[in-house]
Amino acid sequence: MASADKNGSNLPSVSGSRLQSRKPPNLSITIPPPESQAPGEQDSMLPERRKNPAYLKSVSLQEPRGRWQEGAEKRPGFRRQASLSQSIRKSTAQWFGVSGDWEGKRQNWHRRSLHHCSVHYGRLKASCQRELELPSQEVPSFQGTESPKPCKMPKIVDPLARGRAFRHPDEVDRPHAAHPPLTPGVLSLTSFTSVRSGYSHLPRRKRISVAHMSFQAAAALLKGRSVLDATGQRCRHVKRSFAYPSFLEEDAVDGADTFDSSFFSKEEMSSMPDDVFESPPLSASYFRGVPHSASPVSPDGVHIPLKEYSGGRALGPGTQRGKRIASKVKHFAFDRKKRHYGLGVVGNWLNRSYRRSISSTVQRQLESFDSHRPYFTYWLTFVHIIITLLVICTYGIAPVGFAQHVTTQLVLKNRGVYESVKYIQQENFWIGPSSIDLIHLGAKFSPCIRKDQQIEQLVRRERDIERTSGCCVQNDRSGCIQTLKKDCSETLATFVKWQNDTGPSDKSDLSQKQPSAVVCHQDPRTCEEPASSGAHIWPDDITKWPICTEQAQSNHTGLLHIDCKIKGRPCCIGTKGSCEITTREYCEFMHGYFHEDATLCSQVHCLDKVCGLLPFLNPEVPDQFYRIWLSLFLHAGIVHCLVSVVFQMTILRDLEKLAGWHRISIIFILSGITGNLASAIFLPYRAEVGPAGSQFGLLACLFVELFQSWQLLERPWKAFFNLSAIVLFLFICGLLPWIDNIAHIFGFLSGMLLAFAFLPYITFGTSDKYRKRALILVSLLVFAGLFASLVLWLYIYPINWPWIEYLTCFPFTSRFCEKYELDQVLH
């Protein structure tokens, strides 16, 4: 026992252990007890705790943790993951802006609203205007945390500029010593300047790839320049304020500096603002109003010479960063204007402004607003331009004007002689293709979307007439054509048609039973595919005969209507599914679709051919519902596309900056679909293309934004009347031909309902928050009811109100809207 105590009682003892038995008897291990330190010494060993809580967390650097931080920043315990229904409810509430923890985003929405209102709807109130000119109060800035604001400095986010030489510029020529990283607040000083560390060696340069040098050489040869000048141009014209990552200097720092400037966490990166495009433009007059005594201040209190700062020079001696960016690039990078909520492009045109008295809560919401990138606007404009150019190059341009274009030509018709024929075509003042080509491309056209009663009656009458037709054979055996008896010359031709029991037929042989009518160049007795035999005997009704794909190999069958040379076949003419049996020349002159393999109009489906795109699942039932949204990407011509591009690059782009691409794209597409759906109901036989309903839906968004920012504007009634005057003017323009006012009206209604639900909203208190939730629910329910009623009217209860034509084409003169649509009244 004494030996055990001597060797240390704190050592583990295991009975029967071989290691313990082999221990030398004279070996003794003495472990001194831990010395108790004085409270003053213990506190002095800890790192000094900053009084400012902004130093507890750094965006750019990571501080070494002390004992005083371990208790405050403990790892959170495990929590149960939220259920799917809770996640859906939370995401939905955040989307509509009615969640309880959405205060931060609501402030962003409010700031965007003020920016937009100041541009679109006139002057703001004085308090709001002053608040917009002040910096953000919620986010700590460089001037507020490190030094008083000496001058107006551009903010440049440069997360890679975090070297030791910048943090400790006084130690450039002295031995390096370990320092804890000090990064003030949310944004470090290095984020506002572009200074690289490292003074020991030159920067590394990235080698030029072979492909890049090849492209440079090819471009030089095309321009007639020397290849050596093109390859050396890169080295001579490297003028940039920020070097690429491969050009960065290596920091001669120790392990601590390498650790604290390695990577950024997800939370830190999300908190860094994108201030590259939010700063004012850099110019020579930028520091003109700054006194000579005022200069930027570094983190250690060292004044930076203004000349060196404005010139883009490094802080330390011997450092070079290159030259400044070109003036155009700087203007593009630093002079991006924010979009004020309630003020935008239209408000800037109409000289709107905020009112003078606005609460501090609303001011904070307006202050934190930022602008989105208009990705949807750029994508939509690119698609519109490309599709319009392809359509023009493929289908050409129709006659330009507002009237009807008449073309007369001598064409070979059914009787075998040339006749003077007129082709009437509606002129297109948009400088684009004809209406027939637009329908074939996917324009809004009701007969291609659902079954139309008038067109069905037209097809039924044509088939009744075809049952009484026969084969008109020329007496000189020059040819034959399927026609009526009244159209067949009694002196120059023979009309071949058997009645019920007349004609050569064998009553005993049912397979050789003579049909009740005759079709030129088709007979069930000579057709081998499909053959008329057994259970597949062709009926007496010729309108139910199939297309014969294979005839019997015989030069002379003895049948007059088979041995003749056929001159006319079915041709689909017009946009209503009308069919005529005529010559190929006449069909091409009338811009129809000639069917070479068919002999009867009942064997072809003209409406399926006229509509184009994907074939109908059932040739008798149109089902191209996708025309409702496909027509949003088509235009009637070059001028139409230019008008859409101007509208999108002003109104749509401005609204997308405010609300983001996802919200604006939903409003744009749904309002356009609703407008086209209503136009298909009330104007079924008119081919319409273009985003007319979508554009008026965006105009409705301006009204909704005006209503939501009513308390912020100095003169809201003036802004309302100005917007109303613009919409009224556009509605009057819709009374002209080729402009769809029905799509405008319903697109405006649907856009207003969707804007109340999806656009950002500024809350003016708790009651206003609950009012917003009720407004979202009511708006979505009303829109769903409107859309469902339009679908029912289109498919189940079709309506035909001729008087509604005056809303989209008012007859200012007797011939202004006459025959605007060819064959509008079907006979």
From Swiss-Prot:
On assembly, the entry states: Interacts with EGF. Interacts (via cytoplasmic N-terminus) with FRMD8/iTAP; this interaction leads to mutual protein stabilization. Interacts with ADAM17/TACE.
Give the top-rank taxon of the lineage listed in the UniProt record for this protein: Eukaryota
List the gene name.
Answer: Rhbdf2
In this chain, composition skew of type Polar residues spans 1-19
Topological domain, Cytoplasmic: which ranges? 1-381, 649-663, 708-718, 766-773
Which stretches of this protein does UniProt put in the Lumenal compartment? 403-627, 685-686, 740-744, 795-827
Q: What does this protein do?
A: Regulates ADAM17 protease, a sheddase of the epidermal growth factor (EGF) receptor ligands and TNF, thereby plays a role in sleep, cell survival, proliferation, migration and inflammation. Does not exhibit any protease activity on its own.
Q: Where is the composition biased (Basic and acidic residues)?
A: 64-76
Q: What name appears for this protein in its UniProt entry?
A: Inactive rhomboid protein 2
The PTM Phosphoserine maps to S60, S83, S87, S293, S295, S298
List cellular component terms (GO): endoplasmic reticulum; endoplasmic reticulum membrane; plasma membrane
Residue stretches spanning the membrane: 382-402, 628-648, 664-684, 687-707, 719-739, 745-765, 774-794
Question: Has keyword Hydrolase?
Answer: no
Report the sequence similarity comment from the record: Belongs to the peptidase S54 family.
UniProt source species: Mus musculus
| Listed Pfam families | iRhom1-2_N, Rhomboid
This protein's membrane topology, according to the annotation, is:
Multi-pass membrane protein
Q: Which residues form the signal peptide?
A: none
Q: Which GO terms describe its biological process?
A: negative regulation of protein secretion; protein localization to plasma membrane; protein transport
Arranged from A to Z, the UniProt key words for this protein are: Endoplasmic reticulum, Membrane, Phosphoprotein, Protein transport, Transmembrane, Transmembrane helix, Transport
Q: Which stretches does the entry tag as region Disordered?
A: 1-86
Q: Any idea where this protein resides? A: Endoplasmic reticulum membrane
